[in-house]
Design a protein with these regions (language model features):
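Conserved beta-strand-loop-alpha-helix junction that forms the acyl-donor binding cleft
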Residues: 315-325, 342-343
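Phosphate-handling substructures
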Residues: 70-128, 196-197
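Active-site-proximal alpha-helix that buttresses catalytic centers in soluble enzyme cores
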Residues: 7-72, 76
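Acidic, low-complexity terminal tails and accessory targeting/binding regions
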Residues: 87-95, 159-229, 348-356
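Acetyl-CoA-dependent GNAT
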Residues: 236-281, 286, 299
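Conserved active-site alpha-helix within GNAT-family acetyltransferase domains
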Residues: 157, 296, 320-337
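Conserved acetyl-CoA-binding loop-helix of GNAT-fold acetyltransferases
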Residues: 34, 285, 291-304, 330
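Conserved acyl-CoA
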Residues: 136, 297-313
Length: 356
């Protein structure tokens, strides 16, 4: 009999930025690394003979909580990947909701009906992961192994093993980041011992330290460039408000890429302007639209645009006392130097580290 710990990856930037990231790669967030540390503590006293992960960074980084402290090698297997999301890959969930809302509901609730061009079906994902888990389990008969995989794929497999038909898997639990399930493979029988345990994500005082953020059906913006005359007026007003409130600088003619963010309304809720590849010129969310995670979604768009244009770092120039400082610091922007005018350049490294 093989004991198999099946683990969802830690929080990745795609989760935070509200973008679809099936086969799309990306870094872990600061919270994600906190989850990895909590997972490492959980497995300190658990014997593990081998560790597997998909070949995507977010699972490899998560698996480092187990294989590194135990001095094991990491085995990468593409069959452990998340669902291929086809044409959805890299799109904001808000954009998917606007353009393909029915299929987005299917993705979360009516999984047997979910279809996306150039992507997998739920049944294909379920079959792929089950075959991979069984194959790996047979290879390590009599041992204990850990496998880091992805939320949708894990949900499809565990739902089947717990007796949910594909039509009902949408009623089954969703996995927290780094949630741990234990399976046993005994001959042909693959059974669930426990599912989706996240007890390691709580501190000794029972305060949650790193729980999962909202699902795909919750807040997510879509974006467009200003093209209408009335939008130019809105742009000027939002840009002026941003300059006054956040201490960002720069005239409109210095900006090379401008996006409005829409939070399910006709009027824009947010503004992102890039001064060039790797430099945010302006980032602003209307006061009445704050506390919904929209600011970090704008950072996500800046990250995507920078990476798509060959950049490896992202920066913004702020006044030292800018109220925007906290948002950027929370999202791993570090002060690197001051300008001659006394402003501070904050920079974020967009590269995935290669040591996991």
């Amino acid at each position: 009999m093989t004991r198999i710990y099946l683990i969802r990856h830690a929080e990745a930037e795609g989760n935070l930025y509200r973008i679809a990231q099936g086969h799309t790669d990306g870094r872990l967030t600061k919270r994600g690394w906190e989850q990895v540390k909590a997972l490492e503590h959980r497995f300190e006293s658990i014997h593990v003979d081998a560790v597997y992960a998909s070949d995507l960074y977010r699972t490899r980084a998560t698996a480092s909580a187990i294989y590194k402290p135990k001095g094991l090698l990491l085995h990468q297997d593409p069959a452990l990947r998340e669902a291929n999301l086809g044409v959805w890959e890299g799109m904001p969930w808000g954009e998917i909701s606007r353009l393909d809302g029915e299929q987005l509901v299917n993705f979360s609730i009516r999984t047997h009906l979910w279809r996306v061009a150039e992507g997998e079906t739920a049944a294909q994902v379920q079959q792929r992961l089950e075959e991979a888990v069984r194959r790996i389990g047979r290879k390590h008969d009599g041992q204990t192994i850990a496998i880091a995989s992805h939320g949708f794929a894990i949900r499809m497999l565990l739902g089947k093993l717990q007796g949910y038909p594909l039509e009902k898997i949408g009623e089954s639990p969703q996995e927290d980041n780094t949630a741990v399930s234990l399976l046993e493979l005994d001959g042909q029988e693959l059974r669930v011992v426990f599912r989706s345990d996240n007890s390691h994500l709580f501190s000794l005082t029972e305060k949650t330290i790193a729980r999962k953020r909202p699902s795909a059906l919750e807040h997510g913006m879509y974006y467009c460039q200003p093209v209408l005359p009335q939008q130019e007026e809105i742009l000027e007003k939002m840009a002026d408000a941003a300059r006054k409130e956040t201490g960002t600088i720069g005239a409109q003619e210095e900006m090379c890429h401008t996006l409005f963010g829409f939070n399910g309304q006709e009027a824009p809720s947010a503004l992102l302007q890039m001064r060039g590849v790797g430099q945010i010129g302006m980032l602003y969310v209307l006061p009445e639209e704050r506390q919904q995670g929209l600011g970090v979604q704008l950072i996500g768009r800046a990250v995507q645009w920078t990476l798509a244009n060959g950049g490896q770092t992202l920066c913004i120039v702020l006044e030292e006392q800018s109220p925007a400082w906290a948002l950027f610091a929370e999202n791993e922007f570090l002060p690197v130097k001051k300008t001659p005018e006394g402003l501070v350049i904050l920079e974020k490294d967009l590269r995935c580290t290669s040591d996991v």
